[in-house]
């Protein structure tokens, strides 16, 4: 096979992958504001300066794009958890802080702080809320359930903690989502605010 032809195909594929990634990020931002049914693919296309027909070349339906946005959203949370759990010492408590129930689980504490850091990306958290709201759709519900189950399993494996602690951890995470949706998150998440949000005083 002609080498130039092969290289051209590889380059085209890479370009499409980059466009796909950009498109999904733009979709997260738009879906975060208007939800699955209220969002126009035309507006998403304008965000990344591509044509609407090209959107449907990459994703046959708007729902396909929404499902891809769900995956990207959960992928980013999982990546944050993995990074935090790999080096929990980065999130050690300052001497002036204490935990209401003792030192707690270091890895779980680190993952909580990593999630608090994501609050600066308000659209990411708002999109999660829109994904939950769209669960009346069978495909969306199945995808969200699959990713939520995977996320809780990952957090449990990374922290080696109890079911009760994991339940409390994700309950606080949902509280963070609600706080973010009300716009009550500061521009920069201060240490004291983050500690209070995930159970530290």
What positions do the PLM features span?
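Basic, helix-initiating cap at the start of DNA-binding domains
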Residues: 1-34, 38-47, 64
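Alpha-helix C-capping/helix-to-loop hinge sites
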Residues: 34, 84, 114, 131, ...
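Helical hydrophobic small-molecule/effector-binding pocket
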Residues: 75, 90-129, 135-139
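Hydrophobic alpha-helical segments that form the core
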Residues: 122-134, 148-201
């Amino acid at each position: 096979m002609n080498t130039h032809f092969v290289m051209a195909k590889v380059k085209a594929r890479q370009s499409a992958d980059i466009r796909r990634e950009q498109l999904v990020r733009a979709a997260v931002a738009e879906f975060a504001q208007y939800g699955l049914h209220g969002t126009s693919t035309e507006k998403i296309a304008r965000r990344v300066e591509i044509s609407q027909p090209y959107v449907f070349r990459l994703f046959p339906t708007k729902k396909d794009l929404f499902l891809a946005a769900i995956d990207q959203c959960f992928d980013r949370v999982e990546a944050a958890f993995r990074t935090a759990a790999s080096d929990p010492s980065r999130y050690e408590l300052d001497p002036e802080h204490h935990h209401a129930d003792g030192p707690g689980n270091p890895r779980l504490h680190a993952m909580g702080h990593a999630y608090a850091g994501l609050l600066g990306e308000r659209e990411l958290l708002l999109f999660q809320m829109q994904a939950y709201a769209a669960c009346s759709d069978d495909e969306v519900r199945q995808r969200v359930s699959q990713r939520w189950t995977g996320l809780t399993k990952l957090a449990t494996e990374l922290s080696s903690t109890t079911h009760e602690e994991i339940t409390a951890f994700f309950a606080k995470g949902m509280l963070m989502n609600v706080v973010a949706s009300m716009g009550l998150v500061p521009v920069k998440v201060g240490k004291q605010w983050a500690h209070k949000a995930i159970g530290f005083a």
